[in-house]
């Protein structure tokens, strides 16, 4: 099934069930108001949502018109919040090996490299991204992420995968010029990781069929910067640590509670002709080939679109479409 959260003036929004073709949605009010409620009681509530999802898809006739018997409405991605607008935990990592670029601190070592990000204020898929300065090195990061249920302390990678409830896409914004100084302090990124946005829709793994296997999502992640396609990266390629590894690593000394979100980092493809999912990887490749980086980071007014299509050619999660805007006094207000 496919789930989204619609804006309703509150911080947590309203849970909606979305048709498979992403054309219409139906409020899940009679079952649950918030996605976190469903994650907390997954075994009881998710079958009810599945029934609504099946009915919503059945209500669409061969012409693609929704039956008036269903209280469905055309979905507008601009009205979507992040599927989980705020979460108990957001942990992002660097699961990919990029053979085209020199290894960095995030890709070295025997185990996964993870950092704890801000989870109290996720951004919607079409929300503009305010930044204080272009000099901070504004970079997008197109990623695949998962939302988990409870995962026990000491879970193995296989057991950890049993805790995956939903898949989604992320844009984990990074301010590259601030990152080295923070990493040098030894405490991980803070100011350099200001905003994370998510796809309008989160989906259960069965929605992608055999493309989800062994903790990897074997589909192409597409990134378009200012309308120009810069990345068609295979998300299942060059995965050094799959989601089972990432979650098990996190659970080595703690347990996870339902509603934790885990990201795998910018998708990196072994074939350089497939482009990139973050500007930093492109600049690293340029430095390796030419001795210096030529591609600049994002500027005010730039846009980024991140999307993944299934093997049927249809969008799986909907698209993240964001514009970089200068921070204004009104924007900075609560």
Predicted regions and their residues:
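Active-site pocket scaffolds in enzymes
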Residues: 261-301, 307-309
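Short beta-strand-centered aromatic/proline hotspots
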Residues: 16
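Short, Lys/Arg- and Gly-enriched loop/turn segments at beta-strand edges
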Residues: 154-156, 270-278, 311-321
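Short, solvent-exposed loop/turn positions at domain surfaces
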Residues: 132-134, 250, 292
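Active-site microenvironments in enzyme catalytic cores
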Residues: 2-8, 19-21, 29, 33-233, ...
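Short, well-ordered loop/turn sites that connect or cap secondary structure elements
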Residues: 250, 255-256, 298
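Generic structural signal for buried aliphatic residues
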Residues: 144, 256, 262-263, 304
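Structural signal for terminal/edge beta-strands and the immediately following C-terminal loop/tail
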Residues: 305-334
């Amino acid at each position: 099934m496919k789930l989204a959260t619609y804006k309703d003036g509150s911080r947590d929004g309203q849970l909606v069930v979305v048709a498979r073709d992403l054309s219409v949605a139906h409020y899940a009010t009679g079952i649950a108001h918030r996605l976190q409620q469903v994650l907390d009681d997954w075994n009881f509530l998710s079958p009810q949502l599945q029934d609504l999802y099946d009915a919503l898809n059945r209500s669409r006739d061969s012409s693609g018109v929704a039956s008036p018997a269903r209280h469905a409405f055309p979905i507008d991605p601009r009205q979507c919040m992040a599927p989980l607008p705020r979460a108990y935990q957001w942990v992002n990592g660097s699961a990919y090996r990029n053979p085209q670029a020199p290894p960095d601190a995030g890709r070295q070592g025997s185990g996964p490299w993870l950092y704890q990000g801000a989870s109290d204020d996720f951004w919607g898929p079409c929300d503009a991204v305010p930044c204080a300065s272009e000099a901070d090195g504004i970079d997008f990061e197109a990623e695949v992420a998962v939302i988990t249920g409870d995962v026990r302390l000491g879970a193995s990678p296989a057991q950890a995968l049993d805790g995956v409830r939903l898949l989604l896409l992320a844009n984990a914004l990074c301010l590259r010029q601030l990152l080295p100084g923070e990493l040098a302090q030894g405490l991980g990124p803070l100011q350099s990781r200001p905003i994370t946005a998510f796809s309008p829709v989160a989906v259960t793994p069965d929605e992608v069929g055999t493309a989800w296997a062994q903790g990897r999502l074997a589909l192409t992640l597409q990134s378009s910067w200012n309308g120009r396609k810069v990345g068609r990266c295979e998300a299942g390629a060059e995965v050094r640590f799959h989601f089972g590894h990432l979650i098990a690593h996190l659970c080595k000394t703690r347990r996870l509670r339902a509603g934790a979100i885990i990201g795998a980092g910018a998708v990196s493809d072994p074939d350089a002709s497939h482009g990139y999912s973050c500007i930093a990887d492109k600049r690293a490749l340029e430095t390796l080939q030419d001795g210096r980086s030529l591609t600049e980071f994002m500027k005010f007014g730039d846009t980024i679109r991140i999307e993944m299509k299934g093997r049927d050619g249809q969008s799986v999660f909907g698209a993240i479409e964001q514009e970089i805007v200068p921070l204004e006094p009104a924007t900075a207000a609560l």
